[in-house]
Amino acid sequence: MRIAVICFCLLGIASALPVKPTSSGSSEEKQLNNKYPDAVATWLKPDPSQKQTFLEPQNSVSSEETDDNKQNTLPSKSNESPEQTDDLDDDDENSQEVNSDDSDDAETPDDSDHSNESHHSDESDEADFPTDIPTIAVFTPPFPTESTNDGRGDSVAYGLKSKSKKFRRSNVESPDATEEDFTSHIESEEMHDAPKKTSQLTDHSEETNSDELPKELTPKAKEESKHSNRIESQENSKLSQEFHSLEDKLDLDHKSEEDKRLKIRISHELDSVSSEVN
């Protein structure tokens, strides 16, 4: 607590002291200002006459430079005579002609070299690609893939078509074969296709039998259904007749009972009336 009180006291004393504005500048300038204030003021504010004295030599130097440039750019007509100018023109024309001749000479060997190169290239092309050797095109026919025709409705016709295609492909594969080779090839294919044909025929016969069986079964089923319908209708008619007969019997019984009751009532009434009369 004591330390805090001491610090607050010091801060209050420091804030109470007057603050002086700091003057900018070095110590030497401060001393000069204090000793010779008038001289410093005149040094900081020079006269306009002094400025003109400083600018005059600069203007003279720049004017001399511009004069030199003009003399260099403009041709001196007074020193040169018309004869000298003509000689200079002739020299220029001769130099241009010589330069053009040199350029033509330089271009001509290039053209000759280019023509020689083209000639050599034509000869090399002719040597590389001779036209005497005939070109033979190699033909590779696709190999046919055998597939079974089981389970097809048109298996017989499909087998005949595939057989004709095989014959054509065999002709394409062996164009130079003899007739004997061709006949042997056909016989081997027929022997190979014989079991396939028999299996195809059996499949076809089974399919036809399976088609005929449902055709035969359909009229029988229709007859049976008709017979069953007739029997049911007859039974229904019998049941309805029996039911009606029972209803009639019940009605008759009910009527008979009512008649009996009426008769009894009438008899009682007659008895009562007779008793009263007596």
Swiss-Prot record:
Post-translational modification: Extensively phosphorylated by FAM20C in the extracellular medium at multiple sites within the S-x-E/pS motif. The phosphorylated form inhibits hydroxyapatite crystallization. Dephosphorylation via a mechanism involving ALPL/TNAP promotes hydroxyapatite crystallization. O-glycosylated.
Family: Belongs to the osteopontin family.
Glycosylation sites: N116, T131, T140, T145, S205, S272
Biological processes, Gene Ontology terms: biomineral tissue development; cell adhesion; osteoblast differentiation; positive regulation of bone resorption
Motif Cell attachment site positions after renumbering to this chain: 152-154
Modified residues (Phosphoserine): 24, 26-27, 60, 62-63, 76, 78, 81, 103, 112, 115, 118, 121, 124, 184, 188, 199, 205, 210, 228, 233, 237, 240, 245, 256, 267, 272, 274-275
Described function: Major non-collagenous bone protein that binds tightly to hydroxyapatite. Appears to form an integral part of the mineralized matrix. Probably important to cell-matrix interaction.
Phosphothreonine modification, residue list: T66, T178, T183, T208
Subunit annotation: Interacts (via N-terminus) with integrin ITGA9:ITGB1.
Keywords: Biomineralization, Cell adhesion, Cytokine, Glycoprotein, Phosphoprotein, Proteoglycan, Secreted, Sialic acid, Signal
Keyword DNA repair annotated: no
Record bears the keyword Cell inner membrane: no
Organism: Ovis aries (Sheep)
Biased composition annotated in UniProt, kind: Acidic residues: 83-110
Protein name, as recorded: Osteopontin
GO CC terms in record: extracellular space
Compositional bias annotation for Basic and acidic residues: 111-122, 182-196, 203-235, 244-271
Gene name for this UniProt entry: SPP1
Principal place of residence: secreted
Biased composition (Polar residues): 49-63, 71-82
